[in-house]
Regions:
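A short beta-strand-turn-helix
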Residues: 104-120
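Hydrophobic h-region of N-terminal signal peptides that target proteins for export
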Residues: 7-17
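C-terminal cap of thioredoxin/glutaredoxin-like
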Residues: 19-87, 210-303
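Short loop/turn microsegments at loop-to-beta-strand junctions
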Residues: 73, 120-121
Length: 303
C-alpha cells in the first residue's frame, strides 16, 4: 500500500489559483483616448488585445484610428491594473533607437549611389510625379556627392501615390525597366524625369521616356518599350510599395537616415546637420550604416 505524503495531499486539495486578471478595459481606454486626442466621432477606434511588452510590468496595446481608407496607429503601454497608460516608445539603450524601422528597410536590388560601405545609409521613398520629391531629389543629387563623397550611400525606393498622381506608377515601372537594363542609366532617368516633370502627362509618358532613351547611354529603346508595355517590372514596384506600407509611410518624400524617419522636403542645411550628427554618433555606436564586404580569394598555396 502506497502512502501519499501529507503535504502533497494537502496541495492537491487546494483550489487551483487563477492568474490575476488584467484591469484593462477597452471601452474605458477608447473613451479616454478619444478625449485625450480630440478624436472626432467619424473616426473609428479599433483597439487590439493587450500583449506582453518589453517591460514586464506593462502590457502593450495597439490602437488604430480609421477614417475612410486611411489608418493611423498608436501604441500605448498599460499598467497591469489598467489605471495608468503611457503613450510613446520603449527604447533599449543597447540597440539603435531606430532598429524597428531599420529591420524593415530592405535595400538589396534597389537603385543606389554613393560610397559602398558608407557609415550612413539614406533610403528615400519617392514619387516621380510629386513636386516635393522633385525638390528633395535635386537637394540630394547636388549636395551629397560633394559634401559626403565617402560617407553616405543613397537607396531609391518607389512609392507612387496613385490616388493623386495618375502617371507616377507607370513612371516607376519605366524606371525599374531602365534599372534592369542598365543600372547606371537609372540615375540619368531619375534626374531627367524630375527635370521634365511639368511636361509629362499620362498620355505622353511613354513617348517622353522613349525620347529620353535616345539620349541615354547603353539603353535599347525597343527593349524599354516592350518592358513598359508588358509592365515587366510592376512586381518590383509593388514590392517597394508594400515595404513602404509596412513602414506606415503615407506621404512622399519620406527618407530614413540610418533609420531616422524624415517626412517631407528637407532643406539641405537641416539634412546636412542630421547626417553630420549621425556620422559623429556612428564613430562610437557602429550600429547602423553599411559594412563594406571584403572579397577574399582562396590562395591554393595556403592549403
Amino acid at each position: 500500500m502506497r502512502f501519499v505524503p501529507l503535504a502533497a495531499l494537502c496541495l492537491a486539495l487546494l483550489p487551483a489559483q487563477e492568474k490575476p486578471k488584467s484591469g484593462f478595459d477597452k471601452a474605458a481606454l477608447e473613451a479616454y483616448v478619444r478625449h485625450l486626442l480630440a478624436v472626432i466621432p467619424e473616426v473609428q477606434v479599433k483597439i487590439d488585445d493587450p500583449k506582453p511588452s518589453q517591460v514586464s510590468t506593462l502590457e502593450q496595446v495597439d490602437v488604430h484610428f480609421i477614417y475612410g481608407e486611411r489608418t493611423q496607429d498608436e501604441t500605448f503601454y498599460i499598467s497591469k491594473d489598467g489605471h495608468k497608460i503611457i503613450r510613446g516608445y520603449i527604447y533599449d539603450l543597447s540597440q539603435n533607437p531606430f532598429k524597428e524601422d531599420l529591420d524593415k528597410l530592405k535595400t538589396s536590388l534597389s537603385p543606389s549611389f554613393g560610397a559602398a560601405g558608407a557609415p550612413v545609409v539614406l533610403v528615400i521613398f519617392s514619387d516621380f510625379q510629386c513636386p516635393n520629391c522633385k525638390e528633395e531629389a535635386k537637394t540630394l543629387r547636388q549636395n551629397l556627392p560633394v559634401a559626403f563623397p565617402k560617407d553616405v550611400r543613397v537607396y531609391f525606393k518607389d512609392f507612387p501615390l496613385e490616388q493623386i498622381h495618375p502617371w507616377a506608377k507607370p513612371a516607376a515601372i519605366a524606371g525599374q525597366c531602365i534599372f534592369r537594363e542598365n543600372p547606371a542609366a537609372f540615375w540619368q532617368f531619375h534626374d531627367w524625369i524630375y527635370e521634365h516633370q511639368s511636361e509629362i502627362t499620362p498620355d505622353n509618358l511613354k513617348a517622353k521616356v522613349l525620347e529620353f532613351a535616345q539620349t541615354a547611354k547603353d539603353l535599347d529603346g525597343m527593349q524599354l518599350g516592350r518592358c513598359m508595355d508588358s509592365k515587366a517590372t510592376e512586381a518590383d514596384v509593388n514590392a517597394s510599395i508594400a515595404q513602404g506600407k509596412a513602414l506606415k509611410i503615407d506621404a512622399t518624400p519620406t527618407m530614413f537616415v540610418n533609420g531616422r524617419r524624415l517626412i517631407g522636403n528637407y532643406p539641405w542645411q537641416n539634412l546636412q546637420q542630421i547626417i553630420s550628427g549621425e556620422l559623429n554618433y556612428q564613430k562610437s555606436a557602429q550600429n547602423a550604416g553599411e559594412k563594406c564586404c571584403e572579397l577574399k580569394i582562396p590562395n591554393p598555396l595556403n592549403k
